[in-house]
């Protein structure tokens, strides 16, 4: 290896240490982890593709690091010169290298966070003040509630065992990493964690280092790009893989920790195994709003698949339980059941089992009971498998478990018997874990929500009323619709027969209801209606459930997402509750979903956040008035523009009384991996949600003072006006947006099964919130997040400078306002208007340059005003750890941004001149066929060879670097 290459290799480490010069604490190993992964990767890169490629990567990195230090745009031009001189194969290798290095930096961060957390637990306290505000350790929370708020242990226990957090996994098209890679990333994390363990021998260290290099190389050699869009079944399988990997075992482990925390505050009883603390639901295969690929058949398949997976997971554990429960003493109640089972069981039915394959003798009573449970689980799985494969099964339903009570009954019997015989400690072992899994996951693993647009139900109702000859439902007033729906709901006659004339769309809606009727009711959760505005939207779904013979109707959940819908939501709910039939039907419980994405796209983050806050307060008041317990279902995205942000803070900043021990929240696309990708991440997620929900209920945040509200109302009007004047009223905004961002190329990423537009060839209104945010995140300009804040602050400060004091008081005393400001501050820390200016220079027509300049001036002004309100001199001065992590990531992202901007230029402007230099990459397999082979992976591209793949790799890399996509 040449001498200068060695110098360069050390210089990347040196650059890293320049970016993050000093350790933030004794347990700060981030730069160490990052440097190790980077060194290993660069050695692998050199072995695979030669010294020249390694040097080019290092040159780009160093120029990017220099840009980050000096913010000199000349550096960006220099990176551009290096990148445009590459041939297509080299271009792909270099881009892939940066994308890969960013992923390694993320993995180093995760290992560092886990390491600091372990140190914290050993010390028994928070590492620093910051983590106290962003972490929610369950034990810490219980102690705080008792000591600071003087709650009794019993009060805490009662609140905890009655609360529910329902996490709803959605396949939103934002998980841009393939599963093949996610698994390799998990193994890299494990190797890195073990390498830094205290008691490791030199031999183990060497073996781990080799394993680490193997995994880094395997990940680098895997195609990052999905070559076909995932189907809803693919998305469902990907989501379910997290249950298999972490959630399944993570839940009982977490509940044991809750038991320990309770014991430490003086509660000598465990959480009841059926306490519904954590529940899981899913939208994968149930969310048909704007996704024509989710058909009734797919919904049916997804439910059967989930049942099969659940039975598989139980089957894998039941024999361990049989080994554990080898006792012969049992209660009389259990003995009766054992004798009955023993008499009726056949001797040769268990040959297909590995363990306990002969009939179990009655002298092992628990094993007799569990053997019967095992048979039923086997049949449950096989029946689901047959139905999935052919739609038919010879296994009768009565030989399977059809509902969770049937499944729990024999397990509860074993538990009671063990306790009665003095073996409670045995009962509280694996059996308790198993009972908790059954209570949490049931037979369906997750409950599937159905989501459909209200218009689709109106179409069905219209077809029915036309068929009955009573006019057009669509043209009726709301009063007339309600009157007719209620008379039908109160009546007994069927509404229509098989001869109802149906278009494909109408058949699709009705067939979905038939699937709900056909499958076991525990497969389903809520029926969510998007674009719901009136009581008739909800009543129509109730009537369709009855007409299609849904035995146990799903609860109907209206979803309010646009700003105007949120404003009108309380009145809509009051009208719904005033319908006596409906009040009798819901039994004092209602769920309402509020959408963060569309409200943000519609009015900007400031106004959306404030309107969501006020809407929740008003909805809760309406529910109180009618004596209804309201559960809020939060449709949050991963990005700040779509309502994302740290879980703990997001929950604690909700209005008082809006959570009250029951919370539903979506865990979307890219956030699933960050929440459940590893055992410790899964544990942390469950802990954060549980602790923050408990704290919000027992120690609600303060209500805003009247003068704060008045100021917020005034600012929201100004913020909305500015946001809309630019996004919707500026005549050339859409043109600028499409030129200055990769929005038009987004669809090529094959991220999700859902189209990125509701209607082709329309403006911003029809663009889904996800690609809208994705495009601005890619250029690091984040316009939807900050636009409006600056105008709002400027307006109230110009009006009266004393308002600055009020705003600072709001920031220091009101959690909602603080979280809103802190999240935007974090986005500014990730943003870079210099990068956005490069996109403008290369991609936007000259007559629009002044528009981009104006937006960037607005960005800078907003940032300064935000810092003034927060009382900060620099961005993130209160969170040095996050600041350090972002500094380390920035150089990689900058190199990818420059590459992306030039790729877009080459794709969009065929006349753009580039002068490729000599081919750099050497490939060890065949010197005649180097990296150019990579170009052939994409056979469908309409662009010049290699351009599309390079562009997609930049999108994925930047998404990994921003740690959120859409």
From Swiss-Prot:
Enzyme nomenclature, EC number: 4.1.1.31
Any GO molecular function: phosphoenolpyruvate carboxylase activity
Subcellular location: Cytoplasm
Record comment: activity regulation: By light-reversible phosphorylation.
Alphabetical GO biological process terms: carbon fixation; leaf development; photosynthesis; tricarboxylic acid cycle
Reactions catalysed: oxaloacetate + phosphate = phosphoenolpyruvate + hydrogencarbonate
GO annotations of cellular component type: apoplast; chloroplast; cytosol
Active site: 172, 601
InterPro entries: PEP_COase, PEP_COase_bac/pln-type, PEP_COase_Lys_AS, PEPCASE_His_AS, Pyrv/PenolPyrv_kinase-like_dom
Keyword Lyase: yes
Gene3D superfamilies linked to this entry: Phosphoenolpyruvate/pyruvate domain
Keyword terms: Allosteric enzyme, Carbon dioxide fixation, Cytoplasm, Lyase, Magnesium, Phosphoprotein, Photosynthesis
Cofactors, names only: Mg(2+)
Modified residues (Phosphoserine): 11
Domain of life: Eukaryota
Function comment: Through the carboxylation of phosphoenolpyruvate (PEP) it forms oxaloacetate, a four-carbon dicarboxylic acid source for the tricarboxylic acid cycle.
Record's subunit section: Homotetramer.
Similarity annotation: Belongs to the PEPCase type 1 family.
Protein name (database record): Phosphoenolpyruvate carboxylase, housekeeping isozyme
Phylogenetic placement of the source organism: Eukaryota, Viridiplantae, Streptophyta, Embryophyta, Tracheophyta
